[in-house]
Amino acid sequence: VASLVGSEMCIRDSSKNLVSEMKNTFMEIKQGWPKTLPKNIIHGDLFIDNIFFHRGKFLGFIDFYFSSNDFEAYELATCINALCFNKKKKTFSYDKGKTLQLIKGYETIRKLQKKEKDCLNILCKGSALRYLATRSYDYINTPKSAIIKKKDPREYIQKLAFHKKINSFSSYIK
């Protein structure tokens, strides 16, 4: 059993080779990672705790620590991972309706290009692997005295497994 030992709990995955699986997934993502998609300044961390709404309307967002010049569609992929799964106890299930609404809203401002749609799956995998790796590292290495809240990385094992089953843009919305 692969274990990631943190200061407060031991994270155990039923996979016997989580680290090996992460390395293999990284190599797969690296090989398929797009070279030329539209780039712009992105937030890079649009999770619900960084987005503010008032009476159902977007108000603003905070925490620009991970802002960078990157693929615009990568921002969308991170939003899918952060906002389009429902949690019931310790299980995360994908919600096509949320993704469809997210993409529809996104496209009222900027239409996705065909090549961005074609790359959405690899971008979602890359985003999920990023959060699995960084949250695992933070969970293990953040001292108890730190001000930040450690976040459980295990949800990203489930999200990454979901993305591995998907092979097209339409699978995300239909």
Residue ranges and their predicted role:
Residues 1-6, 10-11:
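Single conserved hydrophobic/aromatic residue that forms the stacking wall/gate
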Residues 19-22, 102, 119-120:
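A structural signal for short hydrophobic/aromatic patches embedded in well-ordered alpha helices
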Residues 23, 99-103, 153, 157-160:
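Hydrophobic core segments within long, regular secondary-structure runs in both alpha-
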Residues 27-74:
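Active-site acidic catalytic loop and adjacent metal/ATP-binding pocket
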Residues 73-111, 127-143:
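Active-site activation/catalytic loop segments of kinase-like enzymes and analogous catalytic loops
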Residues 114-124:
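All-alpha amphipathic helical-bundle segments outside canonical DNA-binding/catalytic cores
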Residues 131-174:
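ATP/Mg2+ or Mg2+-diphosphate-binding catalytic cores
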